[in-house]
Amino acid sequence: MNTGSLPHLFARLAALERRIRDAVAARRQADPNPDDPFRGLYLSDEAIETLLASRREPFVPFQATGTAGRLGALAEVARLSSLDVELLLVALAPDVDSRFEQFYGYLNDDVTRRRATAGLALRLCGLPEAAAAGRSRLDPASPLVAAGLLVVEDRERPFLSRSLRVPDRVVNHLLGDDRPDAALTGVARVVDEPAVSADVGRLVQGLRAGIRLVYLRERPGGGAAELGAAALRQAGFGVVEVDAGRLRGEPDHAELVKAVLREAVLRGAGVVLGPVEDEPPLRAMGHPSVPLVVFGSELWNPQWSVDPPLNQDAVALPVASRAQLWRDRLGGRLAAGVDPASATAHFVLGPQQIARAAQAASVSALVDGGVVTVEHLRAGARGQNAAGLQRLARRIEPAVAWDDLVLPAGVVGLLKELAARAKYRGRVIDEWRMRPGGGRGRGVTGLFAGDSGTGKTMSAEVIAASLGLDLYTVNLATVVDKYVGETEKNLERIFTEA
């Protein structure tokens, strides 16, 4: 908890208290019966007569005393004017000092209304209640309200009698508490140290140039979320990562979107949102100071936003980056001579999948002496897509080896070439840069033909075993549909999971 900016905040509240005392004194002078014990619960005849005879004195605008610390940083990020800051302080005061509840109850002439109303806030800022310049700072599109820093309640009431409330998360932030909003648990998280990612130079340059919308197309093993987070960090922003699927499924979706934007503004952060399948809440999360990085597997849909994004593909991580991720996650638990990147080179894993696979390998190794072996690594890697595939195909755990095959030597040689191609494709395509044009050539395809019982499935099982992979068989009857489009979708789901 950082409390270094509290003295400045308390000094600003003290200045507000002096203005409130002046307002209370002026109110008591004009009140025909200031000591009435039922004041605020009814209006006497004398009070009505005094109200009818009252005249408004000329308003004296407040003198801004500057901003510093967290209040100043928030004003800069949220693009608050000096009037916005003063309105925020007026609304904030009862949450920091309980005496302000009584002050506001008195000035509101209602002991049950212990927060500042819009009218009272404007008066304390030295503005007429009818001043458009002041009222506009409290409408839904204003910087304070749009960023979720101030809530104007009681919408059914006349504007001047609507209560102003500062959300607890904003109060806590200004008091030095950096914990994220509890409402975002399971939906969003703050990323302090993004995982190793691909080159982010182009994205960083765009963010520093003022681009506020980025779309990353997720490729297998690419790690779009980590790419976006790394770019934001290098561009000087914090990172709030949002699970778009969970956000979309929450019943209070709209309020959570506001909470995400507020968290990003408080932290001076950007938002990483994905994976998206349909139109994301770009307008609700839009803010001139908050970069928004959206990612998904589909191409960007121009109908999602009137502002075009900076587009980039999140391609698979280079071998060196994957190796560094494995080493960072496993530390000194690896068995001697084991290269995790080589052992899992034929698995297409992104940064998050590598992190989960490394953790799974470490857990499995605990019952085998605590040393992580190649078998542990491959089992952890296999587990990253097993759940999704088993819903679409039948899993076979290989239990045979090359010596179990009874085939002509030439056929066995071809099978071993096929296995070698799958094993070393990462080195050939990534390290040696032998990828064909158009992004083709990553997959390995084999066509086995022969009568029943000649060893087609067994050969596939042997290849899978040599690579440390599981084998999945697909029943075409569950895939082929009378509509060609549905058949294509079924096949795409299988290969995407694989």
Regions found by a protein language model. Give the residues of each.
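AAA+ P-loop ATPase motor domain of ring mechanoenzymes
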Residues: Y42-V77, F103-R113, P158-V240, A244-G249, ...
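Short helix-coil junctions and helix-kink-helix linkers
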Residues: N108-D109, L120-A133
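Conserved nucleotide-sensing/catalytic segment adjacent to the nucleotide-binding pocket
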Residues: L256-G286, T496-A498
